[in-house]
Amino acid sequence: MQAHAAETKKVDVLLVGGGIMSSTLAVWLHELEPSWSMEMVERLDGVAEESSNGWNNAGTGHSALAELNYTPEDKDGNVNISKAIEINEAFQISRQFWSWQVRQGVLKNPHSFINTTPHMSFVWGDDNIKFLKKRYDALQASPLFRPMQYSEDHAQIAKWVPLMMEGRDPNQKLAVTWTPIGTDVNFGEITRQFVGHLQTQKGFELKLSSEVQDITRNKDGSWHVEYKNLKDGTESATDAKFLFIGAGGGALKLLQKSGIPEAKEYAGFPVGGSFLVTENPTVAMQHMAKAYGIASTGAPPMSVPHLDTRVLDGKRVILFGPFATFSTKFLKNGSYLDLLSSTTTHNVWPMTKVGIDQYPLVEYLAGQLMLSDDDRFEALRTYFPNAKKEEWRLWQAGQRVQIIKRDAEKGGVLKLGTEVVASEDRTIAGLLGASPGASTAAPIMLHVLETVFKEKVATPEWQAKIKEIVPSYGTKLNDSAAATQKEWNYTAEVLQLGKPPVIDASVEFGGAASKPVESKPENDMAL
């Protein structure tokens, strides 16, 4: 149905999806162009109920301090740290963005959404220990990673993570890195606070329980979006000069619906994740870290297990996982027909090719699906030897849609990270992919602005405002210990985080960002 012109609302910006990405973009735009009218459409009954919900996140506060898959080894055995630096720099932009929002009163009570939580890498086995030491040494070349400490001493490790050491074989060889400046972030809380603030502003409207039915282009180049209220069945329409699709797993199908040729390049493959969780306060209070392991031999790096301290719904809990799950849904609250309905004549071959080329990944997923409760509990005990089965339950987290892009040579390739897909005329943009996801929402949305509103970003007005919000904009913190220290101190104070360690100014930095190596695509698959 083409809604009658009289019923069609007109806005400058329409955002589809009420998660961390859309809300972050809306806050950016409201800062830069307060007079623009905006509408946000969300199919569920509240914002941040899909992947932005804390219980549906696979992990948070990603800043490459502990995730070993962001520092691959090259064929000569050298550890490449360029991806880790890129992700850490991006996270510092997020910290600055949130700090500004706290100062403006948009975000309230920093402890409700961000808390200091040390990040650790925790490995055993001679090869893994050797790799971790090499990784630690390589990262010391960057001021961003200077506070990291390395230890193979059981007594020291027990001081950091007593829970992981009690009941462990004293002769087991271990190696860990411990970084005190890590954080745990609740993106559901940030999203709710962002949208709550936007709702108090003139020119912003939120439509909940509203599912997009159709997206068509108007003669004047704007977008006509029709949506249905799932509660009462009423249908509405909005015309927007700019349309952003930040609908998580639902983004691919909506981009396909728009008919833009750029969307034909992509296919999506859903991967879910489940976690073991304990809410026992006695246990939770004994563990204060996000401890990342290394993928078992033969398993792809996406399977890296972690024992995570999280603050969810105001209480401290521990999550262990992820264990891969499979469903043809693209969203936790999606349809089992999602995978089939997103498959087209354009993307079926790339998907098939990736399935053939990534056979170990397929094998891994199949193996994960066959795990029993006992298998999962045994995996937990390698990290927490004294865990009691009755204190843990299995929780199904959110769905991630791994993106596959058409490739002239290979037919199709798995794509790393998140990808901004925009039309040639830059009137519509969508976000595909999953990792590192929400942790880098502020810089990813800044990238959307640079892509879509290129001319405006170049104006002195936008430049000045962006630099006010993100003081380090346009510079590389990695190049300067003084700039890194300044940014840490500023954001830690505003966000009420632990006082950052002082970087030793006598150490020379620079040249740490080795040239990126081509890492395996599954390195970045987020569960």
Swiss-Prot record:
InterPro entries attached to this UniProt entry: FAD/NAD-bd_sf, MQO
Key word Hydrolase present: no
Catalyzed reaction equations: (S)-malate + a quinone = a quinol + oxaloacetate
GO biological process: tricarboxylic acid cycle
Keyword field: FAD, Flavoprotein, Oxidoreductase, Tricarboxylic acid cycle
Family annotation (Gene3D superfamilies): D-Amino Acid Oxidase, subunit A, domain 2 (3.30.9.10), FAD/NAD(P)-binding domain (3.50.50.60)
Entry similarity comment: Belongs to the MQO family.
One GO MF term attached to the UniProt entry: 2-hydroxyglutarate dehydrogenase activity
The protein's name: Probable malate:quinone oxidoreductase 2
Pathway in which this enzyme or protein is active: Carbohydrate metabolism; tricarboxylic acid cycle; oxaloacetate from (S)-malate (quinone route): step 1/1
Record-linked Pfam families: Mqo
Enzyme Commission (EC) number: 1.1.5.4
UniProt cofactor(s): FAD
PANTHER family referenced in this protein's UniProt entry, alphabetically: L-2-HYDROXYGLUTARATE DEHYDROGENASE, MITOCHONDRIAL
